[in-house]
UniProtKB/Swiss-Prot annotation:
Chain sites annotated for binding Zn(2+) 1: H159, H161, H256, D277
Any GO BP annotation: mRNA processing
Protein family: Belongs to the metallo-beta-lactamase superfamily. RNA-metabolizing metallo-beta-lactamase-like family. CPSF2/YSH1 subfamily.
Coiled-coil spans in chain: none
Phylogenetic lineage: Eukaryota, Fungi, Dikarya, Ascomycota, Saccharomycotina
Tagged with keyword Nucleus: yes
Designated name of the protein: Endoribonuclease YSH1
Compositional bias ranges of the Acidic residues kind: 601-612
Region (Disordered): 598-627
Top-level EC class as recorded in UniProt: hydrolase
Length: 870
């Protein structure tokens, strides 16, 4: 690439770059220099790692950061996923802030009390905050004492189920947590009622003991804690992205229950997808889980069913209704223990539809025994807009205003008033049968063999639901542990749990295509089987860039994965406009050259086609590949102010800083006072020897002043005693200014002891533009010697021409009007010395000639020169 000046005079005013080796002394740099090699091709961006990089927080500003840009488009450059290596509790090559850390406080190798910590770039996120339904008191909490919760910046709740959200009031009101909490609108709407019901049913909301003790008898949190936590919770819409202190997260549909969502999280270039509990199968009222448009680096996925396979939903509904119909036919009762929200609404939709299709069942009562569900049914009626198309269409129809306005379902307000006479179906909470209405009905109906209990959800280890699957002959009373009840009631498991099975989970992992998978929310055995199955599936990728690694950490076990994120900078403001103009010119030249090449190829192809037609041959050649037209390397150097905040890097000109960052700026000016024993003419000679030209802007009896390279000011106070009292001033706005000032100061300090000074001061000299010297062995004047070679335009053109001659030899032919041609074979390059332009159909030759001319401009120019050169 060749710099395009506006005029011939301007062309030769371009000073050559300053190299550090040319300065006699360099000061320590207080600024960070970063060099980014950025390259954009038509397919993707390949970016090399910076030679030096550092994460800057709180909008620290680094001046004079240099970016070597090979291609820049649309004002910014993107990159692909960061490269990574991983260890498990081992030291690795990455700094601590470059390590992604996963720490499970609960829900690892178990189902229940889901709570996970992820940490990267000093940002901490907690994913879910549940309680274990099979445990009580503090034992049901995640292991909060194993991690400093005050470090958590954001807490994301995936859905309202107890094992994912029940410890949230405790975290928000009774711990040192100070972060922000987010969940979807529907989840928050249900959260309040669910938590209050949970406190009541599990009896953990009793009044505190007088001494404030924390034993099993004291409450873990109160209704007041729930209400206060409720007010602090913030909401997020599906498909909306929020950014908090450099953490970006987006919510996507997860299926499972109303309001359930996945979170796609981005921190400093690292992408993490947390599925929560999710279902890839659309049911009667919810969407299936979505596949996010971006691919994550790390997937944190549930593994509830491990390698198990679930039956098709149609078959599950057929089995459910068949068992219910058969039990009613023989005069029995059917108990369906469910979670109050989610699975319950799905079953009620199935039963209401089945009853409407079977007249012989319409005299049999179907009851829903849950005060909580009745309260929350209004939420379901409100949020039909986020349900699937079937529900939304049903809601909008005139025949039935709301699909949750059931015709054949009745609610039980008080179990003591329930008239248990004849066959019936009761959908009751809780789903694990630990307490409440479902447990009372189980104990009441258990001795009768005509009755049936159908377990429709996932059964957690240690609960009565899990115990029933073992078909015990006796069950323990919930109110009196010493009393046992004979169990003759039939037991069926027909899982409507809205979780993924192995096939669905495996297909989802394949679609999102992560390089790392962390399995959570699953018992040890099924989770271990799932890990083995996934590793076996991706065994062929081992050792390649597409390798997939799978982890199943235990609770309180830290997983460390090293990610070296790449620094990406956006060029903004006037700096971007300048670069875009340069790039447009380069792209135009590139396209023009490529079009010429395509034209030549087309002409050759047409000639070849004519020959083939004459010979009766068919054309089997392929068309030129146009994908390479846009490949571009510029080598353009861009300088500006680098602003870093929340992992975003912006490169700006100083004057644009306030507009784009709202940062205020200050100018720092440095002064250095020194004294030397020499006259001004000798000082000027030494400075010109180094810099070629100094601009004297004031020369009177009181003061002398000059400017060097428009950066460093040198003042001399002539009113002070013998010697020169010098003040050197410069603005600390970049590394070059500091280095240039150091060089000037070093030259001034060396004048007194320089051998050249001694020699020059011992002879008669005229320290003007030329210097008069004598031979060492004679007092006669020999000839004037210039500080530098001639810098006029004609002389520099001659030296550039000599450089081209040395490069291309006899292939170079000089033409009148300061032009030349270079002919190599059939390829000709036209050179215009005045405009510093090269015209050539061959990109290779054109680039070579332009590089020689560019180097010649640099070599023939001093560091600084008189703007009035002839």
């Amino acid at each position: 690439m060749c710099i395009q000046p506006d005029s011939l005079e301007d062309a030769y005013k371009i000073p050559r770059p300053v190299h550090r080796e040319e300065f006699t002394q360099l000061s320590p740099s207080f600024f960070q220099t970063a060099t980014f090699q950025l390259e954009k091709t038509n397919e993707k961006n390949n970016i090399e790692e910076p030679k030096k990089n550092k994460a800057f927080l709180n909008s620290k500003i680094i001046y004079k950061d240099l970016f070597e840009i090979r291609k820049l488009s649309n004002n910014f450059v993107n990159t692909s996923h960061p490269t990574c290596t991983e260890t498990m509790n081992e030291q690795n090559e990455f700094s601590d802030e470059e390590n992604f850390k996963f720490f499970g406080l609960g829900g690892c190798n178990e189902v229940g009390r889901s709570c996970h910590i992820i940490e990267y770039k000093n940002k901490v996120i907690m994913l879910d905050s549940g309680m274990h339904p099979a445990l009580s008191g503090h034992a049901s909490f995640p292991y909060f004492d194993e991690y400093d919760i005050s470090k958590v910046d954001i807490l994301l709740i995936s859905h309202f189920h107890v094992d994912h959200s029940a410890s949230l009031p405790y975290v928000m009101q009774q711990s040192n947590f100070r972060g922000k909490v987010f969940m979807t609108h529907a989840t928050k709407a249900i959260y309040r009622w669910l938590m209050q019901d949970f406190v009541r049913v599990t009896s953990i909301g009793n009044s505190r003991s007088e001494d404030g003790g924390g034993g099993e008898g004291s409450n873990l949190y109160t209704d007041d804690d729930i209400m206060k936590s409720f007010d602090r919770i913030e909401t997020i819409d599906y498909h909306s992205t929020m950014e908090i202190d450099g953490i970006r997260f987006t919510a996507y549909h997860a299926g499972h229950v109303l309001g359930a969502c996945m979170y796609f999280i981005e921190i400093g270039g690292l992408k993490v997808l947390f599925t929560g509990d999710y279902s890839r199968e659309e049911n009667r009222h919810l969407h299936a889980a979505e596949v996010p448009p971006l691919k994550p680096d790390i997937l944190i996925s549930e593994s509830t069913f491990g390698t198990g396979t679930l039956e098709p939903r149609i078959e599950l509904e057929r089995k459910l209704t068949t068992h219910i119909h058969a039990t009613i036919a023989k005069g029995g009762r059917v108990l369906l223990p469910v979670f109050a929200l989610g699975n319950a609404q799905e079953l009620l939709l199935i039963l209401d539809e089945y009853w409407s299709q079977n007249e012989d069942l319409q005299n049999v009562n179907v009851f829903y025994a849950s005060n909580l569900a009745k309260k929350c049914m209004a939420v379901y009626e409100t949020y039909t807009g986020i349900m699937n198309d079937k529900i939304r269409l049903s809601s909008a129809s005139s025949e039935k205003s709301n699909p949750f306005d059931f015709k054949y379902i009745k609610s039980i307000k008080d179990l003591s008033k329930f008239q248990d006479m004849g066959p019936s179906v009761v959908v009751a909470t809780p789903g694990m049968l630990q307490a409440g209405v479902s447990r009372q009905l189980l104990e009441k109906w258990a001795p009768d063999g005509k009755n049936l209990v159908i377990l429709t959800g996932y059964s957690v280890e240690g609960t009565m639901a899990k115990e029933l699957l073992k078909e015990p002959t006796m069950i323990q009373s919930a109110t009196n542990p010493d009393m046992t009840i004979p169990r003759r009631i039939g037991i069926e498991e027909i899982s409507f749990a809205a979780h993924v099975d192995f096939q669905q989970n495996s297909e989802f992992i394949e679609k999102v295509s992560p390089s790392k998978v962390i399995l959570v929310h699953g018992d040890s055995v099924p989770m271990g089987r799932l890990k083995s199955a996934l590793l076996s599936k991706y065994a062929s990728r081992k050792g390649t860039d597409q390798e997939v690694k799978v982890y199943n950490p235990k609770n309180c076990e830290e997983l460390i994965i090293g990610f070296k994120g790449l620094k990406i900078a956006k060029v903004l403001g006037s700096l971007a406009e300048e670069q875009l103009q340069v790039l447009k010119k380069i792209i135009q030249d590139e396209v023009s050259a490529e079009n010429s090449k395509i034209t030549e190829l087309t002409e050759e192809k047409e000639e070849a086609d004519e020959i083939k037609e004459d010979n009766g041959e068919t054309d089997t050649t392929q068309k030129p590949n146009e994908s390479s037209i846009n490949v571009l390397k510029t080598g353009q150097v861009v300088s500006g102010v680098l602003v870093s905040k929340d992992f975003n890097l912006n490169l700006l000109q100083l004057q644009d800083l306030h507009e784009f960052t709202q940062l205020s700026t200050s100018i720092v000016k440095s002064k250095m006072h020194l004294k030397i024993n020499a006259d001004i003419s000798l000082m000027v000679w030494h400075l010109e020897q180094m810099f070629g030209y100094i601009n004297v802007i004031n020369d009177d009896d009181e003061e002398w002043e000059c400017v060097i390279m428009d950066v460093v000011d040198v003042f001399i106070d002539r009113s002070k005693g013998p010697g020169l009292f010098i003040t050197v001033e410069w603005i600390n706005d970049n590394l070059m200014a500091d280095s240039l000032a150091d060089s000037v100061i070093a030259i001034l300090y060396s004048i007194d002891s320089s051998p050249a000074s001694v020699k020059l001061s011992s002879q008669n000299h005229n320290h003007g533009d030329n210097h008069i010297v004598k031979k060492e062995d004679s007092m006669e004047i020999d000839r004037p010697v210039e500080a530098h070679a001639k810098t006029d335009i004609k002389s520099r053109i001659e030296r550039i021409a000599l450089l081209l001659k040395a490069q291309f030899g006899d292939s170079l032919k000089e033409l009148p009007e300061e032009k030349a041609i270079i002919q190599i074979g059939k390829t000709v390059a036209n050179v215009d010395y005045k405009r510093l332009e090269v015209e050539c159909s061959s990109k290779v030759l054109k680039d070579r000639v332009e590089n020689v001319i560019k180097r010649g401009c640099q070599l023939t120019a001093p560091l600084s020169q008189n703007p009035k050169i002839a």
